[in-house]
Amino acid sequence: MTSDKLLQSIGLCAKAGALIVGTPMICEALKASKKRICLILSASDNSDNTAKRLRDRSTHYGVTLHILEVDGVRLGRAIGKSGHVAAVAVTDENLCRLVQKHLAQKQSEQSEDTSQDLLSSSTK
């Protein structure tokens, strides 16, 4: 459920024009500092080279990188694209907070699921 909310909030960023789409465009925007990038979201099925490139650039420019549990096709669909999208970057502070809120909810749900799994396996 939270995954849907997360993808919907990313789609909202796209509709608001507060999203940079694609690894080359993100790297160029970071280098040129044309738009302030708040958060980079990467698909889970990226190649090692793409993942390293995003990780290195986000570290160098001090931008948070989050790897989603969503493949590139699903990420692309969330923003209205028909193909694979490796990464997107959020440029609006308020929308960034919305996306981060949904990321935090998803992580807390996952940690609850993990602790429940541990409890159920220890009682068996």
Give the positions of each predicted feature.
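Signal for well-folded cores of large energy- and translation-related assemblies
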Residues: 11, 31, 59, 80, ...
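C-terminal structural segments of small proteins and small subunits
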Residues: 76-114
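Charge-patterned, long linear interaction tracts outside catalytic cores
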Residues: 117-124
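N-terminal positively charged helical leader segments and presequences
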Residues: 33-55, 63-64
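N-terminal first-folded block
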Residues: 5-42
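Short, ordered loop/turn segments at secondary-structure junctions
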Residues: 24, 45, 70-73, 93
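Charged, alpha-helix-enriched surfaces in structured cytosolic catalytic cores
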Residues: 1, 5, 49, 70, ...
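Mid-chain, well-packed structural core segment of small domains
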Residues: 54-85
